[in-house]
């Protein structure tokens, strides 16, 4: 998992939850937009990844590898495979990790 451009944002609060910014390609993370799109569906996840393509953001939740809820499709160790296979070439990616 590569880390990029985390020098601008290190931690953010979204809807009352603290997150660490792990990855933020070209500073694409828009906290205001994310606060509207980050619903309670993502509450159980340890990470939320967003990919921007064609000026739209798509979100996906991931669990830590050691979380008993982790499966091959939501294990954070498989995120790079997801990006390679399902994200548009050149899309900007951000990854935030819930601070517990």
Language model segments and positions:
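N-terminal leader/targeting segments and the first structural element of proteins
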Residues: 1-53
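A residue-level signal for beta-strand positions that form part of recognition/binding surfaces
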Residues: 18, 56, 93
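A broadly conserved detector of short glycine/acidic/proline-rich loop/turn motifs that flank catalytic sites
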Residues: 25, 63, 100
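Acidic, Ser/Thr- and Gly-enriched intrinsically disordered low-complexity segments
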Residues: 37-38, 42, 47, 67-75, ...
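Short, structured protein-protein interaction patches enriched in aromatics and acidic/basic residues
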Residues: 51-65
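Helix-rich interaction surfaces within compact, conserved domain-sized segments
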Residues: 71-100
């Amino acid at each position: 998992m590569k880390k990029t451009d985390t020098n601008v944002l290190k931690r953010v609060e979204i809807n009352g939850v603290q997150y660490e910014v792990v990855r933020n390609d070209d500073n694409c993370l828009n906290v205001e937009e994310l606060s509207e799109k980050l619903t309670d569906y993502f509450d159980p996840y340890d990470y939320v990844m967003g990919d921007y393509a064609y000026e739209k953001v798509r979100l996906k939740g991931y669990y830590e590898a050691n979380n008993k809820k982790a499966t091959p499709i939501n294990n954070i160790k498989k995120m790079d495979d997801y990006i390679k296979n399902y994200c548009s070439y050149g899309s900007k990616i951000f990854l935030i990790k819930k601070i517990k």
